[in-house]
């Protein structure tokens, strides 16, 4: 059995290309901002995403529900290229209460989450796949590493208020998430969702701040 497993692993690796940087550490080449997020590259090559602090608040005659929709309108940064089978590795940092995510195979490019008003029934987490990144966001039971709405990660895998490494394997019949070296979640995938598409980084709401570094991809043929 051990020899069979090793043989399968060897075949899998033989069809995988070398690791390549998905973010060059200098600018946003190869990426497309979606929504009103402010994306920049810091001096050390870290990718910083935040929302505009000078954004106009809603008018004073809005209802509570309209305000909630305004507050939670999303912003994203997507790869221009699309991918089907691959390994993705990156490190992320969120402040206390921060909420972000990684979209997989999202051919909608978050169209429904960034429009006015947003349609939260068709966000990337529901249209395609989203890997949750969550540093204690109030009321959200999906811990970091969860495949949102499909497979929940256990609590305690994330290092609070520090950099965390997440590794995602995307195959035809499985999505697998490893957070800080520990298995977080697995799911066989949903045949009703896209089989290929871009990769996206999320700014969940109008107060989100997130940082990313060492973003790499290994395409599997």
Regions found by a protein language model. Give the residues of each.
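Carbohydrate-interacting regions of secretory-pathway proteins
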Residues: 17-221
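Hydrophobic h-region of N-terminal signal peptides that target proteins for export
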Residues: 7-16
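Sec-dependent signal peptide recognition
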Residues: 1-7
């Amino acid at each position: 059995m051990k020899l069979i497993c090793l043989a399968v692993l060897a075949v899998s690796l033989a069809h995988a290309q070398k690791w390549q940087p998905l973010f060059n550490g200098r600018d946003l080449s190869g990426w497309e901002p979606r929504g009103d997020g402010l994306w920049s590259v810091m001096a050390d090559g870290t990718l910083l995403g935040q929302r505009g602090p000078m954004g106009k608040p809603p008018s004073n005659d809005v209802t509570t529900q309209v305000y909630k929709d305004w507050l939670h309108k999303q912003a994203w940064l997507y790869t221009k290229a699309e991918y089907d089978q691959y390994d993705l590795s990156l490190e992320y940092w969120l402040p206390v209460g921060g909420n972000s995510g990684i979209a997989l195979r999202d051919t909608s490019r978050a169209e429904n989450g960034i429009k006015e008003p947003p349609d939260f029934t068709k966000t990337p987490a529901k249209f395609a796949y989203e890997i949750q990144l969550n540093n204690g966001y109030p009321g959200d039971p999906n811990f970091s590493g969860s495949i949102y709405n499909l497979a929940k990660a256990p609590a305690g895998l994330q290092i609070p208020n520090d950099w965390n490494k997440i590794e995602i394997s995307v195959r035809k019949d499985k999505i697998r998430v490893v957070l800080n070296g520990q298995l977080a979640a697995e799911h066989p995938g949903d045949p009703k969702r896209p089989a290929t598409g871009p990769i996206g980084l999320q700014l969940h709401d109008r107060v989100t701040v997130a940082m990313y570094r060492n973003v790499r991809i290994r395409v599997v043929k």
